[in-house]
Amino acid sequence: MTLRWTKEASPRWDADKRRLFGPAELAAVGLAPPGPGELVADEWWRVTDGDGVVGYGWLDTEWGDARITFFVAPGRRGRGVGDFILEHLEAEAAARGVNYIYNVVPETHPDGPWIKNWLSMHGFREAPRGQLHRQVQATPTRAQARASDSPR
């Protein structure tokens, strides 16, 4: 499986996002469903393979840190797509000089315990206000090298 990481120049709420981000998932991270075709905030990347869109990564840089969120198509979970997205989001954060990446998993999230465990296994530590954070790697990875070369 060859995964591709593509930045969305003008991210909009479309059928693929609706398919992956159900109302419960959006509500769990404090977002209301946008209208069809509506612009969505911050930076978005889509992950594709030969079968189409299999995931999304989202990054919001603020005060030297970056909040990240990512979604993987249910049929593709457990196959490395989440690892791929996390590696690329960290590369994007490093290219922007970010110190920490973090994710907030609300208590109401339908898969909260599983996600917290997965993030913990990937080096994230719990912090106040329900955040799980991890320091951005100083040593560039292949994904970071690609991110620094990609257009913003």
Feature names for model-found ranges:
Residues 12-28, 45-47, 86-91, 124:
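Compositionally biased, non-globular sequence tracts
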Residues 110-119:
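Short, low-order "capping/linker" segments at domain edges
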Residues 78-94, 117:
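Conserved acetyl-CoA-binding loop-helix of GNAT-fold acetyltransferases
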Residues 120-152:
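C-terminal "cap" of GNAT-fold acetyltransferases
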Residues 1-35, 145-152:
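Short amphipathic alpha-helix that is part of the acyltransferase structural core
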Residues 69-78, 107:
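A short, internal acetyl-CoA/4′-phosphopantetheine-binding micro-motif in the GNAT/acyltransferase core
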Residues 46, 51-60, 67:
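Conserved beta-strand in the GNAT
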Residues 93-108:
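Conserved GNAT acetyl-CoA-binding A-motif
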